[in-house]
Regions:
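Conserved catalytic-core motifs of GNAT/GCN5-like acyltransferases
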Residues: 101-103, 113, 118-136
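Conserved acetyl-CoA pyrophosphate-binding loop and the N-cap/start of the following alpha-helix
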Residues: 78-87
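Conserved GNAT acetyl-CoA-binding A-motif
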Residues: 93-106
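Short amphipathic alpha-helix that is part of the acyltransferase structural core
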Residues: 1-32, 123, 133-140
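A conserved beta-strand-loop-helix scaffold within acyl/acetyltransferase catalytic domains
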Residues: 29-73
Length: 140
């Protein structure tokens, strides 16, 4: 592997972002919507193997004391090689002095627990598609 980390949105193929999200069974939108989300984020990380995008993630933050990590995804063929860990660690490092929260895809909680994230007892959410989030086990 010849991995390269990128910390901006320059020359990203947003269609590849969509395809990776589909392959890992995460929510996806059009490439333009993902471009807007990543461009407007506080911190972004993209990981490529040679010229092929293999993973990414982003954090939104007030830059003072709160941050939220979203859209951490790694191609299935690259999972288990430390790439997700690199993405999460880079996002946490880029939001110093911040509490960092996220919601994990069901079944992926242990991955984040290895990075010292802990389950919250009082987390609440207001989702646009509440039924889908309940069906996908994100909410009770």
């Amino acid at each position: 592997m010849n991995l390269r980390l990128q910390f901006d949105t320059t020359a990203i193929d947003w269609n590849q972002v969509v395809e990776i999200l589909k392959k890992v069974d995460m929510a996806y939108y059009t490439g333009e919507i993902h471009q807007m989300a990543f461009t407007n984020s506080h911190s972004v990380v993209f990981v490529s193997d040679d010229e092929n995008l293999v993973g990414f993630g982003r954090a939104i933050s007030d830059g003072a004391y709160q941050a939220v990590i979203y859209d951490v995804a790694v191609l299935p063929s690259y999972q288990g090689k430390g790439i997700g860990k690199m993405i999460v660690q880079a996002l946490v490092k880029n939001t110093p002095h911040c509490n960092v929260i996220l919601y994990a895809s069901p079944g992926k909680e242990a991955f984040y627990e290895k990075e010292n994230f802990r389950r919250m007892k009082t987390g609440m959410a207001l989702f646009l598609d509440a039924k889908r989030m309940q069906e996908n086990r994100f909410t009770e």
